[in-house]
Amino acid sequence: MSNSPLGSGSRISHFTTESTDRGDERASFSSRAFIHTVPPSDPQRQAGRLPIKVLKMLTARGGHILHPEYLQPLPSTPVSPIELDAKKSPLALLAQTCSQIGKPDPAPSKLSAVTGSSASGDKESKSVPLKLSDIGAEDKSSFKPYSKHPDKKDQSASDKSGFRVPSAACPPFTPRTGSPGSPRTPPPPSEPKASSECTDKKEMEQCAKTAPPDGSAHGRLSTELTHSEGTAGCKSLSAAPSPTPASSSSSSSSVLGSGLVAPVSPYKPGHTVFPLPPASMSYPATLAGAYAGYPPQFLAHGVSLDPSKGSSLVGAQLSTLGCTGKSAASSPLTGASPPSVMTASLCRDPYCLSYHCASQLGAGATCAHDLKSGYPLVYPSHALHGVSPPSLPGHPLYPYGFMLPNDPLPHVCNWVSATGPCDKRFSSSEELLGHLRTHTAFPGATDKLLPGYPSSSSLAAAAMACHMHMPPTGASPGPLTLRSPHHHPLGLSSSRYHPYSKSPLPSGGAPVPMPAATGHYYSPYALYGQRLTTASALGYQ
């Protein structure tokens, strides 16, 4: 009994010593794991490490797949890494593309030599990189937007309407001389792509008709506006001047001359842009000079406005009248287009039928009173011309109130009634005012005078009468009687528009007094109030 505790005690002490030994080993192992006594430069420690590239290749999913370009043998000649990277780097491809923009195409012999050498090089070793000059024309990186491949020239000329290149199959034509109003027969617009060669006679004629004399910028506009008129190959354009320019009155394109910009009009060239009187009319010399620099495609058929030619219409009429027209260069309206001549200085009031630039038109005519022919625009026939014809009828384009500086009777009555215009002429403004009182005479008001117009200057009175769009009347105290619904005793100064003053309208809603002598024609401006009178009095038209 006494030995048992000793035995047990010795056994326990053995266990304790064994456990303490194991604890020391664990402590020493933990200290070895976290505290390295071997420096990093130790070769044994470095030999146990794996390279980072190998770790990345092992951890990547597709790293075990090797592309065939890495399995090719390296070339024997030393190659710089820039040349190795020139084919694959996007920056290198971009620099290569930018460097080749605008360069001319290499010669075909050089191209064949380059392609042959590159093909043989690919047969020998596929790992040799391509240099900048070795890339063929089919490579996308060497795309040149300003150059055309020799095989694709005909196709691109028929596909694109804006970029036309003169092809050898259809040489550029000189514009054919003919009548300006000759009808055209364009091909149907259902053909989107026409042939690029002009072989038939019809296509040759269409080439001659539709080839404009300027650069390729107007090719697209003309094709869009005329529904692809003419074939695509026939539109061979040339920026060089035409070798034989025609006369100024023969065709529309030759009037403009070589190198000038042709007017692109939405109208067909056979039609007139603005309406003109018939060809039997006579034109003054200055109008003919103004229209001489404009293409006759905008004029009526058979009308020629060249005063220098005796065979033209104007020249024949001027010679019969005994007048010599001015040259085109000395005309004050030379170079102006007909729409601007028609509308630049005209009054925009529909009831004002006078023309304000008459002095410019008539300044160069030696016998201008003979140039005027009666061509009524608004009223074809009225009783006044038959009963008492005026001494001098109006201008052909603007017959009412046409004044000339050397005219002995410069003042014209512009009164228009239901029977037609009056058109009577007077030598002084007083006579004109006295005549106008007969048109606008109210009963019992014939003794009043007109204080608004200055009686000293006859030209100023006539010009004011024209710009007021009304004949000056002696019946009303103010000059703007037809425009204003009331009468002012103070004349022109009180007829202005005052925004803060009450308008002295007739009390009780009385109707506007209608002149008895005017008949069925009365100016509608009497109902408009004072705003129109202010605008016209200040000169705003």
Curated annotation (Swiss-Prot):
Transmembrane segments: none annotated. Coiled coil: none annotated. One of its GO terms (biological process) is hindbrain development. One of its GO terms (cellular component) is nucleus. Residues 236-255 have a biased composition (Low complexity). It is found in: Nucleus. Its main location: nucleus. Keywords: Metal-binding, Nucleus, Repressor, Transcription, Transcription regulation, Zinc, Zinc-finger. Gene3D superfamilies: Classic Zinc Finger. Residues 1-49, 97-255, 474-511 are annotated as: Disordered. A zinc finger (C2H2-type) spans 411-439. GO terms for molecular function: zinc ion binding. The keyword Membrane does not apply. Residues 1-18 have a biased composition (Polar residues). Residues 137-157 have a biased composition (Basic and acidic residues). Belongs to the Elbow/Noc family. May function as a transcriptional repressor. This is Zinc finger protein 503. It comes from Xenopus tropicalis (Western clawed frog).
